[in-house]
Each structure stands twice: as structure tokens, then as C-alpha cells.
Amino acid sequence: MASEIHMSEPMCLIENTEAQLVINQEALRILSAITQPVVVVAIVGLYRTGKSYLMNKLAGKRTGFSLGSTVQSHTKGIWMWCVPHPKKAGQTLVLLDTEGLEDVEKGDNQNDCWIFALAVLLSSTFIYNSIGTINQQAMDQLHYVTELTDLIKSKSSPDQSGVDDSANFVGFFPTFVWTLRDFSLELEVNGKPVTSDEYLEHSLTLKKGADKKTKSFNEPRLCIRKFFPKRKCFIFDRPAQRKQLSKLETLREEELCGEFVEQVAEFTSYILSYSSVKTLCGGIIVNGPRLKSLVQTYVGAISNGSLPCMESAVLTLAQIENSAAVQKAITHYEEQMNQKIQMPTETLQELLDLHRPIESEAIEVFLKNSFKDVDQKFQTELGNLLVAKRDAFIKKNMDVSSARCSDLLEDIFGPLEEEVKLGTFSKPGGYYLFLQMRQELEKKYNQAPGKGLQAEAMLKNYFDSKADVVETLLQTDQSLTEAAKEVEEERTKAEAAEAANRELEKKQKEFELMMQQKEKSYQEHVKKLTEKMKDEQKQLLAEQENIIAAKLREQEKFLKEGFENESKKLIREIDTLKQNKSSGKCTIL
């Protein structure tokens, strides 16, 4: 995180006010300044279940997120606390604390669903906090997970394979952590001791049957198992005596239950050690500005009455970042060219030799800062802009050369022009005297350094502009016969034609040079794009293999438990994923 950004306390990120979700612009400004990858940990749960206490522990603070000491819940909307990651240098820990679900004071709990969905969408680790054991009441209270299919879309249009849109959730949903507070029972299943993770998995076991009651029992369990392949569970004893709970944040560790202290330490160690950086499809690492864009896109969709869509969010982010990547690349090109070029160059080749490596650097800058460049729209834009910038430097180089040559011609030939005006050459033999002086001055001009690639063209233009003067001196020189004058005229024409041919040949060579440069530039673009596409494809295949592996594990569990229908559904999803994998398609984009 930028050194000047230090959040000493949490700040509201998304305010839930009058049934409206409103983004806090100051919080967005803070996110904009965080250039590091972000690890986003969000917590949700019923009101007054101690969510904020755990988040303060993750921040390494005694206070911060409001705990409240009465039945009245404190946190409204989603609050954010960005702190340097205590265990991973170069990363920022973004903690998201949410308002209590099903708060009786709110009356209208419509936004509870959106708060839950946003916490899932924005986080890399999603913590669900509840009191007591995982029983049917706890599952019923977690009904929000069953509503995610109605609240979130992975794609903007239906999948042509016919697979349900929610099948893609596993590709971008966070790790699911269930924290059980005031857990007073022994961790046992069928009389045998189990770990907290095993307890969670046992609690997610389905019941056989097709009646309404069984379906209601199975639905939340199915959703958790299908949407969240990475699951973890932590249990916590009651932290202190009931009378002391109202001042929990002020209690010293020795005043707390010893087992609770150990359990909190285990929880914080796991979350801080294993929570991953927030990533998007294709391995796109999320930093502060990218998280800001996701917040704006998702809340904007909700405010407009539509569903937050992962595909739309990624493409919106790509549009913003790819446009910025083009500007970064062009800025790099201009800065480097301005620093390294010494105008005027003596040849076009000299300028192009400078241009090529800097153009290559600019392409690298773009590729490093871009992603999801559908149909190479932005790389094409970059290519066109680089051509325009190159041509602008070529023109400027020629203009500088022309201006320098013009000044030099005026300095060198100015005295000769004055002599012509004074009539110095308007006498017998004056013509040859004029030619002799002009040749000497021409030699002086040609020997002058730093004229650039317009030197010959400017000299030719200058001589052409004085052709009438030369013709007048020739015709008025009484010492020359008519025959001599004709010979001199032919010689002058021949010299002019030779100069014109040289200029034509030069332009032809420059044209060929530009065509060669165009081909080299095109090949450079293709090479770098191919390399990036290979890297992206490799990342995509790795992601899809992980998703397939997760679904296979769950499918095998369903089959082992005797739920053939659920097993077959997952097999269809896996087959579709394998087809997408072979065709190189992202599960989301």
C-alpha cells in the first residue's frame, strides 16, 4: 500500500441507507491508491454474533470495527479496513465487515441478500459467522446461499451448452469459512471425535427423498457444496462470563477463556496464512483500483435493478484498464523518444533504429497492464497510435532539419544575394564569377554538420528558387556567345534533373524502408501477442483443471453417498468444462 495511505480505523465502503446501497467516494479514493495485490476477507452473519471482534483480531487491533454492547446492531452496510498484510509483504489486507443479517430494527431485509451477495463477489475469503452448532436452524438462517442463483450471474448471456449459469460460480467464488461461536458441544459424529472441518462436512450431508421437507433440508447444503469447493470450519468457546461480554474489546487476554484465546489465534493464523489474493478469471490479480471498479460495477447493477454479473464486471474492468494501458504505452514511447532522439537525424534509418526498440518496450508496457483484450481491439488501437506517433516524430525530424537548413542557407548564401543586388555580377564575366562563388558556398554548406536528412532537398529548393536570378545573369553576360549560353542552359538543366533524380531515389528508398519497418513492427506485435496468449491460455487451463478437480471430488462424494442425480448433474458440468478446456474457452468469459 502506498506509504501515505494508512487507515487507522475502518471506513464505510457501501452504506445501506433507506433501502439504498450507496458507495462512499472517500473509500473509493483510498482503494484507488492501493497498487498492491489485495487479500479481501469478508464476514457476514446474523446481527449481534460477534463478527466485528474477529475482524479486529485479523487487523491486529483491539478496537476498530464497532462491536456494540447492546442488542442494537452497529455496522450498517459494508465497512472496509485496509491494512498492510501482517504476514505477506507486498500485499494489502482488505477487511470487509457487514451489517448483521435479519436485524429486527431494519424491518425491510431486502438488502440483506445484496449485502451477502456483494460479500461473496468481492472477497477471496468469505466468513459466515453464527452462534452454536450447525443444525437445521443454522442452515435455514443461511438461506441467502440458496438465493445466490437469483442474485448473481456469471455470464451476461445464457450458456449454449444448456448448463445452468450457477455451475460457473465455483470458478470465482471465494474460500468458505464457517465460524461457530459459543460452541459448547463436543466435536463428535456418531460418538467418534472429529475435527471442526469434518464436523462441517458431516453437517453438509444430504438426505434422501423427494418431498418438500427433504428438498428444503438439502438445498442450502447442496449450494454450499457446489458453489464453495474450498471449505473450512472454526469453533469458538464462549469468550468470557456473560456479564463481561459487553466489554469484550477492553478485556485483557488473561481475562478471557484460555481455549477461546487459542481458538482465535488458530483462526487468525489460518486466515492470514492461507487467504489468497483476490483474482479474476485468467489469473487477473486484483489490486485497489480493480477492487474499486468491481464495487462500482456490482453496486451500479443492483441500483439499476439488474443482477451483478461477473462477466460484465471483468469486461468493464478490462475496458478501463486496457484504455489506460494504451495511454501508458504511448506515454512511455513519447518519453523515451524525446529523451533519446537528437534531432535532426542524418538519415531516416537512424530514427527508425531508435524507434524500433522503444516501440517494442511500449508494446511490453501495454501487454503488462492489459487483459481480456477481446478481438485485440486495444492492441490495434495501440498499433495505430504508435504509427501516428512515429510519423509525427519523422515529420518533426524533417521540420527541424528543414528549419536548420533554411537558417544555414540564409547565413551562407545571404552575402551572395546581397552581391547580386549590388550588381557585382552584372558585368562581362560576371556569370562565371557568380557560379564560382556559389560553388564555394555550396561546398561550405555541404560541410556544415547537423543539417539532417533534408539537407539536399533544401539546397535543391533554394537553387530552384534562385533559377530566375541565375538565368538573368547568364543572359545579360555580354562576354558569352549565344552558343555558350545554350551550353550553359543545358548544363543547368542536367544538374537540376540529376538532383531531382537523386531526391526521387532517396524518397523511394525511404518508402521501402518504411515498408520494411511496417512489416517488422507487425511481426513484433504478432510475436508478443502470441506469447501473451500462450501465457493466458496456460493460466486458463490451470484454472479449469482446478475447477474440474474440485467438481470431480464433489461428484465422487455424491456418488459415494448414493445421490446419483446430483452426481450426474456434476458429470454434465464437468463434460462441458472439458469441452471448454479443449476449445480454450474461459468458464466465465
Swiss-Prot record:
Region (GTPase domain (Globular)): 1-309
Primary location class: membrane
Induction (record text): By IFNG/IFN-gamma and IFNB1/IFN-beta. Up-regulated upon infection by T.gondii or L.monocytogenes. By IRF1 in response to bacterial infection.
Record-listed E.C. numbers: 3.6.5.-
GO cellular component, one term: perinuclear region of cytoplasm
GO molecular function: G protein activity; GTP binding; GTPase activity; GTPase regulator activity
GO biological processes: activation of innate immune response; adhesion of symbiont to host; cellular response to interferon-beta; cellular response to lipopolysaccharide; cellular response to type II interferon; cytolysis in another organism; defense response to bacterium; defense response to Gram-positive bacterium
Residues where Cysteine methyl ester is found: 586
InterPro entries referenced in this protein's UniProt entry, alphabetically: G_GB1_RHD3_dom, GBP_C, Guanylate-bd/ATL_C, Guanylate-bd_C_sf, Guanylate-bd_N, P-loop_NTPase
UniProt KW keywords: Antimicrobial, Cytoplasm, Cytoplasmic vesicle, Golgi apparatus, GTP-binding, Hydrolase, Immunity, Innate immunity, Lipoprotein, Membrane, Methylation, Nucleotide-binding, Prenylation
Limits of the GB1/RHD3-type G domain: 35-276
Tagged with keyword Lipoprotein: yes
Entry-linked Pfam families: GBP, GBP_C
Record-listed GTP binding positions: 45-52, 181-182, 245
Positions where lipid (S-geranylgeranyl cysteine) attaches: 586
Catalyses which reaction(s): GTP + H2O = GDP + phosphate + H(+)
Removed propeptide positions: 587-589
Post-translational modification: Isoprenylation is required for proper subcellular location.
Subcellular location field: Cytoplasmic vesicle membrane; Golgi apparatus membrane; Cytoplasm; Cytoplasm, Perinuclear region
Membrane topology of this protein: Lipid-anchor
Chain's role: Interferon (IFN)-inducible GTPase that plays important roles in innate immunity against a diverse range of bacterial, viral and protozoan pathogens. Hydrolyzes GTP to GMP in 2 consecutive cleavage reactions, but the major reaction product is GDP. Following infection, recruited to the pathogen-containing vacuoles or vacuole-escaped bacteria and acts as a positive regulator of inflammasome assembly by promoting the release of inflammasome ligands from bacteria. Acts by promoting lysis of pathogen-containing vacuoles, releasing pathogens into the cytosol.
Family membership noted in the UniProt record: Belongs to the TRAFAC class dynamin-like GTPase superfamily. GB1/RHD3 GTPase family. GB1 subfamily.
Subunit: Homodimer; homodimerization occurs upon GTP-binding and is required for the association with membranous structures. Heterodimer with other family members, including GBP1, GBP3, GBP4 and GBP5.
Protein name in the entry: Guanylate-binding protein 2
Species assigned in the record: Mus musculus
Designated gene of the protein: Gbp2
